[in-house]
Amino acid sequence: MNCRSEVLEVSVEGRQVDEAMLGLLHTILLHRSTGKFHYKKEGTYSIGTVGTQDVDCDFIDFTFVRVSSDELDRVIRKAVAEFKDALGNSGSDGMGQISLEFYQKKKSRWPFSDECIPWEVWSIKVNVVNLANEQERQICREKVGEKLGEKVINIVEVINRHEYLPKMPTQSEVDNVFDTSLKDVQPYLYKITYQITDSLGTSVSTTMRRLIKDTLAL
């Protein structure tokens, strides 16, 4: 099985990191989650509904849609907060990458542990820019919102392709495909990791600075 890999790049102000990452990660998970499975007997089941809610950002002109699961939101917020703290403490000019990996488990014989096989990985490269004044911050607020809107469209286009998804599991195998620990939603098994690096390149940051400069010149 080949693992799909998608890379998104964003350039944001420090106070926008949380909202930008939450918006993108929640958008992906919205399309990679189902309602809870309710098995009647082996081979037959019903799927519960998945509620959604709009989230307005405070520091970006952007609204995203997420699964209305407070449990899932807490997990994502915790991971994003850790990533933001690591960015702030790194001294690497505010560059890093946060990744959302979907995987399925393959049972192994005792005494070996189960094998985790990734089937889709989303990597978000982040560059934090420093702005000089409130005028630049307002422009950045608008431009980042536009860029995130483009990223959301890109995410939806990728997810709507007819490519590999794990097949619906039997009741005995559901934990090999889905995270069943949440009471109100059932995302595909996933993990979030991050790394801080000074080797991401400066193309995104340069583009954002150029956008701000061009807008100021109007």
From Swiss-Prot:
What Pfam family is a match, any one?
ATG101
UniProtKB keywords: Autophagy, Cytoplasm
A single GO cellular-component term on record: Atg1/ULK1 kinase complex
Q: What GO MF annotations does this protein's record show?
A: protein kinase binding
- Give one GO biological process term: autophagosome assembly
The record ties this protein, via PANTHER family, to: AUTOPHAGY-RELATED PROTEIN 101
- Give the family, as the similarity comment puts it: Belongs to the ATG101 family.
Protein's UniProt name: Autophagy-related protein 101
The species this protein was found in: Danio rerio
The record lists the lineage as:
Eukaryota, Metazoa, Chordata, Craniata, Vertebrata
